[in-house]
């Protein structure tokens, strides 16, 4: 399970999930990627489940990059506890994902295998996603 080694503060505000992703919107390491098309919190358990689904399908071939990291703690109060008396105890870790963010990248496998592996991974995630390919640098030109 992914989580930070140490944090300055144990509890954080929830924050807003407005707008598009600022960075990490292009396929940087691999050949194919899984891009979020809506905003959500993704827990460390969901990231791990998606990773396992991909690597199981690809057997031993290929390489996987996880481009998101759960660095935001979320809290929960125990069951049957009245409102008030402070914020709840830290329950787990989430990654804030906004539209356009590349969450996973794959290389070293064919496009069909990558497409199916990322489809299986997308079923483990609470966001709508799309399959993207790496844009070749200098592939198309507008000259002449």
UniProtKB/Swiss-Prot annotation:
Keywords: Ribonucleoprotein, Ribosomal protein, RNA-binding, rRNA-binding, tRNA-binding. Pfam families: Ribosomal_L16. One of its GO terms (cellular component) is cytosolic large ribosomal subunit. The keyword Coiled coil does not apply. Disulfide bonds: none annotated. It comes from the Bacteria. One of its GO terms (molecular function) is rRNA binding. Gene3D superfamilies: Ribosomal protein L10e/L16. GO terms for biological process: translation. NCBIfam families: rplP_bact. Part of the 50S ribosomal subunit. Binds 23S rRNA and is also seen to make contacts with the A and possibly P site tRNAs. Belongs to the universal ribosomal protein uL16 family. This is Large ribosomal subunit protein uL16. It comes from Oceanobacillus iheyensis (strain DSM 14371 / CIP 107618 / JCM 11309 / KCTC 3954 / HTE831). The gene is rplP.
């Amino acid at each position: 399970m992914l989580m930070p080694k140490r944090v300055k503060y144990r509890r954080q505000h929830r924050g807003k999930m407005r707008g598009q992703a600022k960075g990490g919107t292009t396929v940087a390491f691999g050949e194919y990627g899984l891009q979020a098309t809506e905003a959500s919190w993704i827990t460390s358990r969901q990231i791990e489940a998606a990773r396992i689904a991909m690597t199981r399908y690809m057997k031993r071939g290929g390489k996987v990059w996880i481009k998101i990291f759960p660095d935001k703690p979320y809290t929960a109060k125990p069951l049957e506890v009245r409102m008030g008396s402070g914020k709840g105890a830290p329950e787990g870790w989430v990654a804030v994902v906004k539209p356009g963010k590349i969450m996973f990248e794959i290389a070293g496998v064919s496009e069909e295998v990558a497409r199916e592996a990322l489809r299986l991974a997308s079923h483990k995630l609470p966001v709508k996603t799309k399959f993207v390919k790496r844009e070749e640098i200098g592939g198309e030109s507008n000259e002449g």
